Design a protein with these regions (language model features):
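Basic nucleic-acid-binding interfaces
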Residues: 2-3, 11-101
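Active-site flanking residues adjacent to catalytic metal/cofactor-binding acidic residues
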Residues: 6
């Protein structure tokens, strides 16, 4: 499984993003990545579906940079990750906190 994770400079985003709220930029990114088969996981982390490969990741990032003129100047860091195993650690947290099943 592949993932894309990124960090946007919110100060620059306020200056470059044309909409009323710079927070709308995250929804724009979510919609664009959805078109390439990515699902929002948390924050600025998107997991690719079964058909997403390394090439799809590169094409998706190229699309973001071309589609949104505010993207390139505001992105501080962006990574493609390959996830070998999907391990949910929430049961550990819940057990320590005494909550959950």
């Amino acid at each position: 499984m592949y993932a894309i994770t990124f960090d946007l400079d919110t100060q620059l985003l306020e200056d470059h993003y044309a909409s009323a709220s710079w927070r709308d930029a995250h929804m724009d990114i979510r919609k664009a990545l959805d078109e390439f088969g990515f699902n929002w996981q948390q924050g600025s982390v998107y997991f690719g579906g079964d058909k997403v490969d390394a090439v799809t990741c590169v094409l998706a990032v190229q699309d973001l940079a071309r589609r949104y003129d505010w993207f390139a100047p505001t992105v501080r860091d962006i990574r493609m990750l390959r996830i070998e195993e999907m391990n949910d650690l929430m049961p550990v947290v819940q057990k320590i906190a005494g909550i959950g099943g």
